[in-house]
């Protein structure tokens, strides 16, 4: 048991040391590059396709919801030969977002009770 504890402490120490070295290696050029990428991401976010709108022109242009990006889903309507593509949120991601919202609200209540 003592060996496991000693090994765990050693592992945590090495991990924190490597994390500190990685932070030291993050120089000004990397910061400028990161800022330019963030600016491009913000600019791209303004041009996204809202949910339930046509995304056939660019299938990767769907907007993000609170946690996940919507997906361009294509289908053929009944009795039609034309393919229709719209930005939609898959059901499993929708349920995950609802669960995350409920967990946030519950966490806030716990904070009020004990905080």
Swiss-Prot record:
Record keywords, A-Z: Disulfide bond, Knottin, Secreted, Signal, Toxin
- Gene Ontology terms, cellular component aspect? extracellular region
The domain comment in this protein's record states: The presence of a 'disulfide through disulfide knot' structurally defines this protein as a knottin.
**One GO molecular-function annotation for this sequence?**
toxin activity
- Top-rank taxon of the source lineage equals Eukaryota
Instruction: Give the residue range of the signal peptide.
Output: 1-20
Question: Keyword Signal, does the record have it?
Answer: yes
What are the top taxonomic ranks of the organism? Eukaryota, Metazoa, Ecdysozoa, Arthropoda, Chelicerata
**A Pfam family assignment:** Toxin_35
Designated name of the protein: U3-lycotoxin-Ls1v
Q: Which residues form the propeptide?
A: 21-44
**Disulfide bonds, paired cysteine numbers:** 48-63, 55-72, 62-87, 74-85
Tissues showing expression: Expressed by the venom gland.
Which family does this protein fall into? Belongs to the neurotoxin 19 (CSTX) family. 01 subfamily.
Claim: Secreted is one of the keywords in the record: yes
């Amino acid at each position: 048991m003592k060996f496991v504890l000693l090994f765990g402490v050693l592992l945590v120490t090495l991990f924190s040391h490597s994390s500190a070295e990685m932070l030291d290696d993050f120089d000004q050029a990397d910061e400028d590059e990161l800022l330019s990428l963030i600016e491009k991401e913000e600019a791209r976010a303004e041009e996204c396709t809202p949910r339930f709108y046509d995304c056939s022109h660019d299938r990767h242009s769907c907007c993000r919801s609170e946690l996940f990006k919507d997906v361009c889903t294509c289908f053929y309507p009944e009795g039609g030969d034309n393919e229709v593509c719209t930005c939609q949120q898959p059901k499993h991601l929708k349920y995950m977002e609802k669960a995350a919202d409920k967990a946030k609200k519950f966490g806030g209540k716990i904070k009020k009770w004990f905080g």
